[in-house]
Curated annotation (Swiss-Prot):
Keyword Iron included in the entry's annotation: yes
Molecular-function GO term, any one: iron ion binding
UniProt-listed HAMAP family: Fe_traffic_YggX
GO cellular component assignments: cytosol
GO annotation terms (biological process): cellular response to oxidative stress
Protein name as annotated: Probable Fe(2+)-trafficking protein
InterPro entries: Fe_traffick_prot_YggX, Fe_traffick_prot_YggX_sf
Organism in which the protein naturally occurs: Acinetobacter baylyi (strain ATCC 33305 / BD413 / ADP1)
One protein family per Pfam: Iron_traffic
Function: Could be a mediator in iron transactions between iron acquisition and iron-requiring processes, such as synthesis and/or repair of Fe-S clusters in biosynthetic enzymes.
Species lineage: Bacteria, Pseudomonadati, Pseudomonadota, Gammaproteobacteria, Moraxellales
UniProt keywords, alphabetically: Iron
Homology family: Belongs to the Fe(2+)-trafficking protein family.
Entry keyword annotation includes Iron: yes
Length: 90
């Protein structure tokens, strides 16, 4: 049976994640409030940001930047960073 959650990005009930994406309270929050579709879209966006901005994910500044961008992404904040020069496939 599919687990449904009220997705905070899409503001509707959608299929939930199969497991928390990371340990702790924040991981549980995403498990409870983010759809599988929204999480996959975030992973794609995060990968694009890492590649285009040449982020080293082991550096604290890069981790902080990605955490801030993740919150903006799931809150539909218009100030979420876009990778310059990147165009999604049509």
């Amino acid at each position: 049976m599919t687990r449904l959650v009220f997705c905070r990005k899409y503001q509707q009930e959608m299929e939930g994640l199969d497991f928390a994406p990371f340990p702790g309270a924040k991981g549980q929050e995403f498990f409870d409030n983010v759809s599988k579709q929204a999480w996959q879209e975030w992973l794609q966006h995060q990968t694009t940001l890492i590649n285009e901005k040449r982020l080293n994910v082991f550096e604290p500044e890069a981790k902080k930047f990605l955490e801030e961008q993740r919150e903006k992404f799931f809150n539909n904040d218009a100030s979420v960073e876009k990778a310059e020069g990147w165009k999604p496939e049509a």
